[in-house]
């Protein structure tokens, strides 16, 4: 379930190298951590035996406004570039840190996730009175 954030909530995306992007955040759909179980059952065992093995930190999806500025298309392009950077015959991936700052909070980066951009939805443009929105999905690698 998405959490609707108060007006003025800022999402800052900071790449491992380069400049950060600041976006007005609308909502965040949080991550669900899960643990895969390894089967350690021997052939002679009559009951399955399993142990926790690897932790999957999950994904975080956040929805933001497409700003009505000259840099709006640059923001989408930068996010796409961060998703997968192709240089010649090699593909590089950019780790990003998502930090959420709530209005009125004296704590910077109250919520922070680190990971890789795994999906970007394009804004739906049509005849409506709503602001343009798009969402970004981050595969979390560290919390």
Label each region the model flagged.
Residues 61-63, 99, 137-139:
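Residues within well-ordered beta-strands of beta-sheet-rich folds
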Residues 1-16, 87-101:
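Short, compositionally biased strand/turn segments
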Residues 73-114:
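Short, acidic/charged, Gly/Pro-enriched secondary-structure junctions
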Residues 130-143:
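Short solvent-exposed strand/turn elements
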Residues 1, 59-86:
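Charged, amphipathic alpha-helical segments
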Residues 2-68, 114-133:
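Solvent-exposed edge beta-strands and adjacent loop segments
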């Amino acid at each position: 379930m998405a959490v609707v954030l108060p007006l003025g909530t800022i999402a800052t995306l900071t790449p491992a190298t380069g400049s950060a992007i600041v976006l007005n955040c609308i909502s965040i759909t949080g991550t669900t951590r899960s643990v895969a179980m390894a089967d350690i059952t021997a052939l002679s065992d009559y009951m399955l035996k399993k142990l926790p093995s690897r932790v999957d930190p999950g994904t975080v999806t956040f929805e933001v406004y497409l700003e009505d500025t000259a840099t709006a298309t640059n923001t989408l392009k930068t996010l796409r570039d961060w998703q997968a950077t192709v240089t010649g015959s090699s593909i590089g991936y950019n780790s990003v840190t998502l930090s959420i700052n709530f209005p009125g909070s004296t704590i910077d980066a109250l919520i922070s996730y680190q990971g890789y951009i795994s999906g970007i939805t394009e804004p739906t443009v049509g005849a409506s009175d709503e602001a343009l929105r798009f969402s970004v999905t981050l595969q979390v690698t560290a919390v």
